[in-house]
Amino acid sequence: MESPRDILKRHGLRAKYSWGQNFLGDEDALEAIADALNLRADEPVVELGPGLGHLTRFLAATGARVTAVERDRDMVMVLEKEAIPGVRVVSGNAATVDFAQVAGAPDVAVAGNLPYHLTSPILFRVLEQRAHVSRAVFTLQKEVVERLAAEPGNRDYGLLTVLLGMHYDAENVLTLEAWRFHPPPKVDSAVLRLTRRKSPRAPIIDEARFTRVVKASFAHRRKTLINSIKSDPTLGTTETLIAALEAAGVDPQRRAETLTPEEFAAIERALGPLTPATSTPAE
């Protein structure tokens, strides 16, 4: 396979540092990433930020129907000239893509070597569209993958860990050293696999309020749970929140990183039915 450096040179291009472009050209790593998605022949898969098409080729080799969504016009030009069989190239923003619409299918797999600065927007997008995303494999900054795959009680455990964990099983499947990329990033990367659960880990009354509960809980990580969660006045008074924590069986003096997704769900349920005053949308 032609290296990223050689493809860029052939097309008279350079990696755009401001776009976070670091191209993975290591064939063993690319094959492992494609294998981690467990694609079936003719299955729809959306690749976000395909760049020069290295992973795209391995995804297409599985027989899957690949839709490659790329924002950089130079990369779109390269992909169209390369004309990889079984691949449809779409110009678009990975952070706002409608997965089902772009793939023309109600349920899709998703893959991508994501620019680090777009990690959170894209993961939140997957959460928003989880009804259409059965599983995903993303190459991310190593410390981000470790955070997303962390267990309660780990200092890496945080907001997105809980929100993703309600609906997906997260696994750190592969570490990728910086030298495997062109140009090499300043830190190592890792591959995150998300597999949608058949049902959420625990029932909740309102998704937006659940998100607010988790956000408020992690807003001040060094504070106790009650002192952090009360920072969101839309959730209720301090007395209401203490009562909800106790009803959920959660000690108000604990810290957010020690709670399981199920415990956060119990807190949300303990806040009771929504009223017009408590139904403010999550930000």
From Swiss-Prot:
One Gene Ontology MF term: 16S rRNA (adenine(1518)-N(6)/adenine(1519)-N(6))-dimethyltransferase activity
Superkingdom of the organism of origin: Bacteria
Gene Ontology CC annotations of this record:
cytosol
Q: Does the keyword Disulfide bond apply?
A: no
The stretch of residues making up the signal peptide is: none
Family of the protein in this entry: Belongs to the class I-like SAM-binding methyltransferase superfamily. rRNA adenine N(6)-methyltransferase family. RsmA subfamily.
Job of this protein: Specifically dimethylates two adjacent adenosines (A1518 and A1519) in the loop of a conserved hairpin near the 3'-end of 16S rRNA in the 30S particle. May play a critical role in biogenesis of 30S subunits.
Which Enzyme Commission number(s) are on file for it?
2.1.1.182
**Principal subcellular localisation of the protein:** cytoplasm
* Localization of this protein: Cytoplasm
One of its Pfam families is RrnaAD
Q: What is this protein called?
A: Ribosomal RNA small subunit methyltransferase A
State the UniProt keywords alphabetically: Cytoplasm, Methyltransferase, RNA-binding, rRNA processing, S-adenosyl-L-methionine, Transferase
Which organism was this protein described from? Myxococcus xanthus (strain DK1622)
Q: Which reaction does it catalyse?
A: adenosine(1518)/adenosine(1519) in 16S rRNA + 4 S-adenosyl-L-methionine = N(6)-dimethyladenosine(1518)/N(6)-dimethyladenosine(1519) in 16S rRNA + 4 S-adenosyl-L-homocysteine + 4 H(+)
InterPro entries (alphabetical): KsgA/Erm (IPR001737), rRNA_Ade_diMease-like_C (IPR023165), rRNA_Ade_Mease_Trfase_CS (IPR020596), rRNA_Ade_methylase_Trfase_N (IPR020598), rRNA_adenine_dimethylase (IPR011530), SAM-dependent_MTases_sf (IPR029063)
Annotated S-adenosyl-L-methionine binding sites? 22, 24, 49, 70, 113
